Amino acid sequence: MTPAQCQARLDAGHVTFVFAPPVSEGKCAIPLPVRLRSLAIGADEIQFTGEPTLDCRLAERLADWIGNVVEPLARHHLGSGLAAIETGPGYVCRNRNNEVAGKLSEHAKGNALDIAAFALRDGRRVAVRPADQLAPAEATFLAAARATACGYFLTVLGPGSDAAHAEHLHVDLGLHGRTTNYRICE
């Protein structure tokens, strides 16, 4: 993808962003990184509080999922639209689960994002936590958002997947297996 193609796709998705310098740190690299700032939905804007640095393709997919699925789910289940998505930085040069050895994390390619919470327009904040730690409507909203993420991303991990993902929702576009045709949705 060229910078012009990235610009056109994110502009079409009503994404406010800036191009970041290409990343190259040893095995870690993002040839076309962007920093996400916000997503416009009609007259409203949803802020990305961490301004994560991501590969353009992930930024496009994320904006599509949030705008077309997560925002309507929040209105339906919680009675309020989204004001912000609280995220991690996106890009981090590290191995999976911060292990000393092992496979490179999708974060190291700008191909993954961790979502810690959803801030609502009415001032509430829905943190990603196990369902038994949430109000029923919040648990239903997070379960629906997580289930729909499995149709947009190739890996979706969150509370109950493992200890490393107990307090955030991890989404990425990492390819899996020899044929690269399956998803991990836990």
Language-model-derived ranges and their functions:
Residues 76-110:
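Active-site-adjacent substructure of cysteine-protease-like catalytic cores
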Residues 28-32, 93-98, 168-170:
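Short, solvent-exposed polar/charged micro-motifs at secondary-structure junctions
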Residues 2-86:
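Active-site acidic/histidine clusters and adjacent loop/turn architecture
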Residues 41, 88-90, 118:
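Beta-hairpin (beta-strand-turn-beta-strand) motif
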Residues 24, 32, 100, 153, ...:
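Glycine-rich, flexible loop/turn motifs
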Residues 37, 71, 104-186:
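Catalytic cores and adjacent binding grooves of peptidoglycan-active enzymes
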Residues 54, 58, 103, 137:
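Conserved aromatic-histidine-acidic binding/catalytic patches
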Residues 1-4, 180-182:
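Short intrinsically disordered, low-complexity coil segments enriched in acidic
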